């Protein structure tokens, strides 16, 4: 409480320059993890530390992955609180630093496809993605992230790799159609749950009202990639909805992208085995697709 009361903007910046004071910031972060009900440590981080880009950069560099997860969890939680308070959580430059951490190390999450993987390093990427999704959800103070030089291309590339990895072998990135109430142990809490859907969400956010990014997605063959993820996937709830949202943003006021969609050819109905397993079938009538319940045997 005393530290919180004594801190101001100038004193916070001094933590960057002094090794002993930097160790104190890491100790405070450790208390946030081990004693989450201790409000004052959370206040120190959210009301002082997060206001300094250089301190965030320095702390993040010195932290273990476990400590980074605590910091990212606080940032994500505060994004919702700050939205209600109409206050700025952190400077744009700090958000750009987090975006660069995601672009530089995003491929770490691919290690989750193997049994021997560093879950904490991958979890850091997953939390970074969730934060970036929230920051780019029409938050004016962070929408300049749309102009980040590598964020969109890195996100599309990562989606490509994950999509191919899930198709080429059976692993945590493979689409699943298990909608029973009793799913395999750990399926509902696996860290990769919804990761692919959130990649598509971020792409949609970055393309909203941004012609340059819309064109970039087309040039990277990202439109077909997103369309290929419109199927229902129990490992990625709402992925089809995020895909539709992303396509809408990619096509908005973009004639070239609209022409690409118009040039697609219909190749018949997709495999509806999964729908039939849920008691439904797809019926084509007058150029439209209808969802019908399966007829029960008498």
Predicted features along the sequence, with ranges:
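Extended alpha-helical scaffold regions
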Residues: 1-298
């Amino acid at each position: 409480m005393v530290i919180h009361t004594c801190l101001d903007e100038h004193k916070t910046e001094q933590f960057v320059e002094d090794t002993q004071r930097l160790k104190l910031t890491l100790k405070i972060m450790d208390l946030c993890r081990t004693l989450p009900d201790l409000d004052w440590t959370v206040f120190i981080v959210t009301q002082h530390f997060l206001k300094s880009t250089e301190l965030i950069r320095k702390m993040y560099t010195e932290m273990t992955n476990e400590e980074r997860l605590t910091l990212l969890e606080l940032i994500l939680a505060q994004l919702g609180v700050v939205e209600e308070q109409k206050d700025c959580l952190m400077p744009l430059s700090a958000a750009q630093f987090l975006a660069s951490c995601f672009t530089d190390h995003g491929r770490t999450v691919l290690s989750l496809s193997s049994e021997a993987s560093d879950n904490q390093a991958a979890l850091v990427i997953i939390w970074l993605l969730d934060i970036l999704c929230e920051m780019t959800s029409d938050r004016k103070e962070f929408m300049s992230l749309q102009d980040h030089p590598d964020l969109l291309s890195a996100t599309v590339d990562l989606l490509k790799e994950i999509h191919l990895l899930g198709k080429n072998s059976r692993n945590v990135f493979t689409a699943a159609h298990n909608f029973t109430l009793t799913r395999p142990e750990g399926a509902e809490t696996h860290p990769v749950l919804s990761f692919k859907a959130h990649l598509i969400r971020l792409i949609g956010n970055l393309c909203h009202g941004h012609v340059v990014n819309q064109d970039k997605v087309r040039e990277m063959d990202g439109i077909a990639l997103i369309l290929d993820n419109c199927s229902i996937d129990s490992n990625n709830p709402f992925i089809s909805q995020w895909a539709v949202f992303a396509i809408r943003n990619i096509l908005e006021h973009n004639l070239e992208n609209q022409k690409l969609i118009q040039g697609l050819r219909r190749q018949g109905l997709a495999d509806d085995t999964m729908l039939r397993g849920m008691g439904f079938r797809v019926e084509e009538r007058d150029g439209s697709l209808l969802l019908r319940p399966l007829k029960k045997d008498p």
